[in-house]
Amino acid sequence: MDLYNMSGSPSTRAVMMTAKAVGVEFNSIQVNTFVGEQLEPWFVKINPQHTIPTLVDNLFVIWETRAIVVYLVEQYGKDDSLYPKDPQKQALINQRLYFDMGTLYDGIAKYFFPLLRTGKPGTQENLEKLNAAFDLLNNFLDGQDYVAGNQLSVADIVILATVSTTEMVDFDLKKFPNVDRWYKNAQKVTPGWDENLARIQSAKKFLAENLIEKL
């Protein structure tokens, strides 16, 4: 099973932790988006949308992080605990996954990812939208240990990958006490956390080295 990815990206880290949870190993193939490798003909042939991560499982090809993690748990999970078959539980998990994609991850991407290109974060408006996204997550977690229901799910894993991106930058989660509490617990109960943290540290080192060149 091949995973075309960029190691430190939140999307890749979400897939890697999910794979760890279901006991799947990948042949990891790095695609450097900073130099445009995702646009090379060989990769566009695999994924016309030229996005990473992209999973190739025999002749089956799937991309988009949240689609990949759901596929992995449904295809390889030993049970349905990470993505229950109950329609209402599944719907809640889906809602949290869509919230991550359209609001939380989007907020982090628009505020922090410009650092990779310019050495400076996004605008004050971007920061306000990011704080609003964390306020929503903080609300979701009021009185709960997990983001969707009463047990660890793929929604926790994906959102953990997103939130842990703040380890690379100066962002205080203590402003959001429910998120901070959940984040500390999620590190303890999520398979693959240590590997996730190692990838973050490598990405942080890369970021620091490149920031020095840009400043």
Curated annotation (Swiss-Prot):
Binding site for glutathione: S9, H50, T51, I52, E64, T65, R66
Catalytic activity: RX + glutathione = an S-substituted glutathione + a halide anion + H(+)
GO molecular function list: glutathione transferase activity
GO BP, sorted A to Z: glutathione metabolic process; response to toxic substance
Keywords from the named record: Detoxification, Transferase
CDD domains, per the entry: GST_C_Delta_Epsilon (cd03177), GST_N_Delta_Epsilon (cd03045)
Leading EC class: transferase
Domain GST N-terminal: from-to ranges: 1-80
Pfam families reported for this sequence: GST_C, GST_N
InterPro entries: Glutathione-S-Trfase_C-like (IPR010987), Glutathione-S-Trfase_C_sf (IPR036282), Glutathione_S-Trfase (IPR040079), Glutathione_S-Trfase_N (IPR004045), GST_C (IPR004046), Thioredoxin-like_sf (IPR036249)
Start and end residues of each GST C-terminal domain: 86-206
One GO cellular component term noted in the UniProt record for this chain: cytoplasm
Enzyme Commission designation: 2.5.1.18
Function field: Conjugation of reduced glutathione to a wide number of exogenous and endogenous hydrophobic electrophiles. May be involved in detoxification.
Subunit text: Homodimer.
Stated family: Belongs to the GST superfamily. Delta family.
Protein name: Glutathione S-transferase D6
Source lineage: Eukaryota, Metazoa, Ecdysozoa, Arthropoda, Hexapoda
Primary gene name: GstD6
